[in-house]
Regions:
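Phosphate-binding P-loop
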Residues: 32-35, 39-47, 239-240, 279
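Long amphipathic alpha-helical segments used for membrane anchoring, targeting, substrate engagement
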Residues: 459-519
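The conserved Walker
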Residues: 52-56, 299, 328
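Conserved P-loop NTPase motor module
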Residues: 1-14, 28, 130-136, 343, ...
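Conserved ATP-driven motor cores of ASCE-family P-loop NTPases powering translocation/secretion/packaging/pilus
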Residues: 2, 66-68, 91-107, 309-395
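P-loop NTPase motor domains
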Residues: 68-78, 85-309, 335, 377-380, ...
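N-terminal pre-Walker A segment at the start of P-loop NTPase domains
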Residues: 13-38
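Conserved lysine of the Walker
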Residues: 60
């Protein structure tokens, strides 16, 4: 048996699929496409996560497009996080250009152009379905990360969330959160301090300044209601194609912390809301995270551990996560080891550090008797990639240098008129377009404080009126004895009782307790 026949048997056996699969392209040997030697990925293993990596301009985005459109065609909804703004073309069919026809001639199957059902989404002022979350849903850990707080400040955030949970104060937007922070060091200082521990005014003021800074970056557009229902990511069109939801994040390039925290929050929400699914013929949802290095670059070790835990557990919910980045080393090893599909485009070696990273990358792939992995990594052309995946039994497939098929959809962006048509036909735009300003912590606390202030003011007027109508002789007597120490003490007691009356309206306990540690 010659080398080529041996290669054909290895690839055909390794990538054989009984069930549904997606076709990425044809396997190559010595730089040439081998006939009838296809690289297929079983749909049932697409919830085992994956990586698409490679230098700029080598075709990562087109590979993402190829996988996403075939998932959609097989009835699997897809969520794409688009930081570069070049994925909207999925909504339009591709064009049968000469180079595409020639590519498919080499592959041995005809090119097919097809548009996919696409929903454009946004967390900012870009056009699209508005994605929002309440501050409560975001949670104290994510919010602390977003605000870049230290441990002491994060502790205060957790305390405030606990207080709001216990007292049924909805935290919907940043306005609510600023209000409860101000309340914690003013009108509600004693009740919160007595029950949960005292809070330093300087710490709270620092947190409020950071929230204002966040608002200036446009974060107030993200927090609010109606919050997005994750079930709306799972829609199927009338033809049985899964919707491709594209979150437009082009204006997030200079705000990686907001993007990464949003992404982590969304993954956590999906994990919490989706039921257990176990092994199934195909995934319920597949998520692609473009520019993944931004996520991990901004993550503390604690948050990286959380991502690792989510990646490990979320596949039981039928969800696959795919990271797209320039270099596999951008993804922590603990997460890299959990990724079933690896698509590696060419890497460029300009420095000694680059060459070292290429050798390190080569070690992450199965040993092949047909390739020198570290050498082929630098010689792959545009639209070519090294691929290894998991077969239907969960066993790693042989390493295959693959000549990738062309996307069925447009390899360019939508023009403004096409985008407007797409948005006008959206079933979700009207549901999420307008912000709902329901009664929440801001309104509840404001009403509470105003009511307490009004009652205190009325009490003050009543006492002043009684004093004016006293007889002059009584007033003189009071003036005479007011210098007495006992009388002054009685006066202080009366004042303290009035304060208790005022604080009682606010629900504030004035019982003296042991002083608790300040945060």
């Amino acid at each position: 048996m010659d080398r080529k026949e041996s290669f054909q048997i290895d690839i055909s056996t390794g990538y054989y699929c009984k069930g549904e699969s997606i076709l990425l392209g044809g396997a190559m040997l010595d730089g040439e496409c081998v006939p009838d030697c296809y690289v297929k990925i079983p749909l049932k293993t697409m919830n085992r996560h994956g990586l698409i990596a490679g230098a700029t301009g080598t075709g990562k985005t087109k590979t993402l497009q190829i996988i996403a459109e075939q998932l959609s065609e097989n009835g699997v909804p897809v969520l794409l996080m688009d930081l570069k703004g070049d994925l909207s073309g999925l909504a339009q069919p591709g064009e049968e250009k000469d180079f595409i026809i020639e590519r498919h001639k080499k592959l041995g199957f005809p090119y097919k152009a097809k548009a996919m059902p696409v929903e454009l989404m946004t967390i900012s002022n870009e056009k699209g379905v508005r994605l929002r979350a309440t501050v409560t849903e975001f949670g104290p850990v994510m919010l602390s990360k977003l605000l870049d707080l230290n441990d002491v400040q994060s502790g205060v955030i957790s305390l405030i969330f606990k207080y709001c949970d216990d007292h049924k104060l909805p935290l919907i937007d940043l306005k609510d959160f600023k209000k409860i922070l101000q309340y914690s060091i003013k009108e509600g200082k004693e009740v919160i301090g007595a029950e949960y521990g005292n809070i330093s005014s300087s710490t709270v003021n620092t947190i409020i300044r950071k929230i204002i800074e966040l608002e200036q970056q446009g974060a107030e557009d993200f927090f609010g209601e109606p919050s997005f229902d994750m079930e709306d990511l799972l829609r199927i069109d009338k033809q049985g194609n899964g919707f491709i939801s594209i979150i437009r994040l082009t204006d997030m390039q200079d705000r990686p912390k907001l993007f990464s925290t949003f992404m982590l929050s969304m993954l956590a929400e999906i994990y919490a809301s989706f039921p257990e699914q176990g092994d199934s013929p195909k995934p319920k949802l597949v998520i692609f995270i473009d520019e993944a290095h931004l996520v991990f670059r901004e993550s503390s070790q604690v948050l990286t551990d959380q991502i690792e835990a989510i990646v490990k557990l979320i596949r039981s919910k039928g969800v696959g996560i795919y990271f797209c980045t320039q270099n596999p080393t951008d993804v922590p090893e603990t997460i890299l080891g959990q990724l079933g599909l690896k698509v590696q485009h060419a890497l460029r070696a300009f420095t000694a550090k680059d060459r070292k990273e290429i050798k390190q990358t080569a070690e992450n792939y199965p040993i092949s008797k047909f390739y020198r992995t570290d050498e082929i990594l630098t010689s792959l052309g545009i639209g070519e990639a090294l691929i290894t995946a998991l077969n239907e039994k969960g066993i790693p497939t042989p390493l295959a240098a693959t000549y990738l098929r062309a996307p069925m959809t447009r390899m360019d962006i939508l023009v403004p008129d096409e985008m407007d048509v797409l948005l006008n036909n959206s079933e979700l735009i009207d549901i999420y377009e307008d912000t709902i300003d329901a009664d929440s912590a801001y309104e509840i606390l404001k009403e509470k404080i105003e009511a307490a202030g009004k009652k205190d003011h009325q009490e003050k007027i009543r006492k002043e009126t009684n004093t004016i109508h006293r007889r002059r002789s009584e007033k003189s007597t009071f003036e005479t004895i007011s210098q007495n120490t006992m009388v002054r003490q009685v006066g202080r007691t009366l004042a303290r009782e009035l304060v208790r009356g005022f604080l009682g309206v606010l629900g504030v306990s004035t019982t003296t307790k042991r002083r608790k540690r300040k945060y």
